[in-house]
Design a protein with these regions (language model features):
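Periplasmic c-type cytochrome electron-transfer domains
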Residues: 2-74, 94, 108-115, 131-141
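Periplasmic/extracellular electron-transfer cofactor-ligation site
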Residues: 73-100, 125-131
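Soluble periplasmic/extracytoplasmic beta-strand elements of cell-envelope proteins
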Residues: 104-106
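Glycine-rich, acidic and aromatic/proline-enriched surface loops and short helix-turn segments
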Residues: 122
Length: 141
């Protein structure tokens, strides 16, 4: 009985703290003020795990096809360089102001292809990463 009572009290306290945090606006929503380390880690871990779970069963096409590489390079130059940069481009107006900062893909190296495809297709909420799959067929992503 003590366990149930303690669990209910702790659960209720957690709900009150969470509701108070939301109601009193304790988490700053502005992109010009970074999250606390704890909030950033929670968001980052949640995002990474959610993408991994959803990308786990994707079948990745042969990424060594020269035509696919050429098409991908053109799409990247047209739609991605402004935020994710390219070799020889250190920063842009857009890459300087986004929070969280988009990864510099020229320095990051090759990401997991299935996860990269999922992110490009579906985007990431509240990050500035567009869901390109809403107006591009999978063959172009």
């Amino acid at each position: 009985m003590n366990f149930i009572k303690s669990s209910l009290i702790l659960g209720g306290a957690g709900l009150l703290i969470g509701a108070g945090t939301i109601y009193f606006g304790l988490i700053h929503p502005g992109a010009d003020e970074p999250h606390s380390a704890l909030v950033f880690k929670l968001i980052e871990t949640t995002r990474d795990r959610a993408i991994a779970v959803r990308a786990d069963d994707l079948v990745v096409p042969a990424l060594t096809d020269p035509a696919m590489i050429k098409q991908g390079a053109g799409n990247y130059a047209a739609m991605c360089v402004g935020c994710h940069l390219a070799p020889g481009i250190e920063s842009t107006e857009m890459s300087k102001i986004l929070y969280p900062a988009p990864p510099n893909l020229a320095k990051l190296g090759a990401p997991d292809p299935a996860r990269a495809f999922w992110v490009i297709k579906h985007g990431v909420k509240a990050s500035g990463m567009a869901a390109w799959g809403t107006n591009m067929k999978d063959d172009y992503i």
